[in-house]
Amino acid sequence: MRDLLDFYASAPLLELGHEADRVREAKHPHGVVTYIVDRNINYTNVCVADCGFCAFYRRPKHGEGYTLSFEQIGEKIEETKALGGVQILIQGGHNPYIPFEWYLDLLRYIKRHHPIHVHGFSPSEVDFFATRFRLEARDVIRELRGAGLDSIPGGGGEILVQRVRDIAAPKKAGADRWLEIMELAHGEGMKTSVTMMYGIGETLAERLEHLERVRALQARTGGFTAFITWPLQPENTPTMSHMPKTDAETYLRTVAIARIVLDN
């Protein structure tokens, strides 16, 4: 890991990018990359997780809190499909007012009236459901899948190092729990994506630790289909508005080292 850390921190950007491209080409030699057209739908912004980096959420009973109706979500799906979209990413805050059956009914409604691939309910949400409704996480996943959930997004991953999570999101599923839920989903035959949000006070070594933990799980299950990374957007966040914004080179270096580490 020390050599990787030195390479990530110190190698010229073009050298780092060239190595990342070499790894990519070894796996995909025909010069073809793929993508999908999808849309994020945040079904509620009411949340009790109180993450320091989140400018989106509103506490319960806040005047700006909302929960979308099934019909509003259906309209957004139809707008997506009209533009060529093939998937929706549906996720939201940890809303203590929504019963578990609502989520199951929503999935059934979507599949019945607006059929589309539903990529939804991150490990953090699954953990919240399990705690809130006194269920095992595996049973939450099975119930959601049975109602129509197709795959699970990597939301709530942030940095999978507990020191960082204790500062940025102490009320949300911890690093081990996040990985555990992903492994449970893979064990149920579900594919998932994985994310990393950086710039929240972690070190470069902790970013690499995040990637190494993801790589180890992928080696066991093969269940991850995509990795997405992005920097903190500090404006209007509860506790991180003072954090410096990272630059474009940091983003390119982070994408490159992720391609090198996540070669499986």
Each language-model region and where it sits:
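Radical SAM/AdoMet-radical enzyme domain recognition
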Residues: C51, V86-I88, F100, L104-M197
